[in-house]
Structures are given as C-alpha cells and as structure tokens.
Amino acid sequence: MQVSYFHVAADVPDAIGSVEGPDAAVVIDVLRATTTIAWALHNGAEAVQAFADLDELRLQSRNWPEQTRLLLGERGGRMLEGFDLGNSPVAVIPEVVQGKRLFMSTTNGTRALQRVRDVSVVMTVALPNRQAVAQRLLRDQPERVWMVGSGWEGTYSLEDSLAAGALADALVAAGAQVANDELQAALALWAQWKHDPEACLRVASHGQRLTRLGNHDADFSCCAGLDQLSVVPTQTEPGVLRAIRV
C-alpha cells in the first residue's frame, strides 16, 4: 500500500480515474466536518449528504421528507441561517439525528469531498475513528491511498496534517509505504503531538479562530478524542456517506 497526503483539494493531481490515480481516497477535516460526520453516523444518522454549493443543498434537501432531514452547515465557523445545526460534533446526538438524512455544507470539508467523489472508494477520517479507518484500509489493501486535507479556504491546516500523520502511523506500522514528503512531515507532526492532540488543535490557526468565536471546549475535546469510534463513513453514492463498521 502506497499512501500519499495532499494538504488541500487543489493539491490533488488530475489523475483520478487513471491508472496513476488512487484506489481509495480518505478525506480529513478535523475541525470539524469529518469529526461531525463520524459522530453523526455513529449516533444513527441514515446518511450524510455533502454539498459544496448551498443552492444545490437546498434544492436536493427539498426532495426529502421534512421530518426525516436535517440541514447542517457553517461558513467561517458560524452556523448558517435557516439551518438546523451548525458543524459541531457534540450536537449530533442520537435523539437529534437518529434515522435522519443530514444535508451538510461546510467551509472546507465538503469541498474536499467533492474533489475526490469519483474515486472508487471514498472514506472520511478524524481522530475519533482513526483506528477504524486504518483497519478498513489494512483489510482491503488498496494499492494507492490518497489522503486529502480540507485546510482552511484553500490553505494548509495543522490539525488535518496531524490526523493524516495519526492514520499513517497506524498504516506504516502494518507495512504501508509513505509515498510523498507531505505525509512524511505529517508523521513527524503526529510524533510531536500524539500525547496531547487537543493542544495541537488549539494552537492551530483554525482552532484559534473557533476560540475567538466563542466557547468550543466541548468541540475541541470531542475532535481530539482518539480511537473512540468503530464507524468508517464511506461514500455509497456520489456525495452520500453511510456508516460502515469494522
């Protein structure tokens, strides 16, 4: 297994669907989209449908019964007007999301998902489901895995690289090969912060941005919780993620 990491969607090569392209893609948005997706599916959401475009989200959501849908979204870390929830993993509790389709759009994570949606296998990872995703990849043994960070508005993010390093650490320990310098750097970052990942999230520029917006202590704690979930959010149709458990 050859594993590469790309900091943001714009860095992903135009090789998807070609013989040089990935056999599996893993999207990362630690603060907070892929953490929220993992917890929502763990807590019984029917699926999470991701949109980069808000107009498309609103249009598609109208085709779903109102009592079985929720709109989740943020821009700049703030909940969108008219939406049911923002992008907090601690808000997607079972009594809120059980059995519902979540229509989701965020500043960064949903763009990264759209970039790789044509890869044959698409998953999402965050720190809480790091080991579950590693186990799935090690079981299936795709030849080429591309991890894709979401970043912040097209720029590098510390926390996504931390999670890339965390996932790579588990894969490399089982024989996977590091295929680019970006992943090698992410491994070094994980080695530095693995004993206190929450501290890394808080010093990251997006972590500081969330702190300025208000008290997000519960979100930081949730997003930093390592290996707590057995769910692997997996694309089952374009843009739609469902729970696969390992």
Curated annotation (Swiss-Prot):
EC code: 3.1.3.71
Cofactor: Mg(2+)
SUPFAM superfamilies the record matches: ComB-like
UniProtKB keywords: Hydrolase, Magnesium
Catalysed reactions, semicolon-separated: (2R)-O-phospho-3-sulfolactate + H2O = (2R)-3-sulfolactate + phosphate
InterPro entries for the chain: ComB-like (IPR005238), ComB-like_sf (IPR036702)
Gene Ontology molecular functions: 2-phosphosulfolactate phosphatase activity; magnesium ion binding; sulfopyruvate decarboxylase activity
Pfam families in the record: 2-ph_phosp (PF04029)
Keyword RNA-binding: no
HAMAP family: ComB (MF_00490)
Protein's name according to its UniProt entry: Probable 2-phosphosulfolactate phosphatase
Species annotation: Synechococcus sp. (strain WH7803)
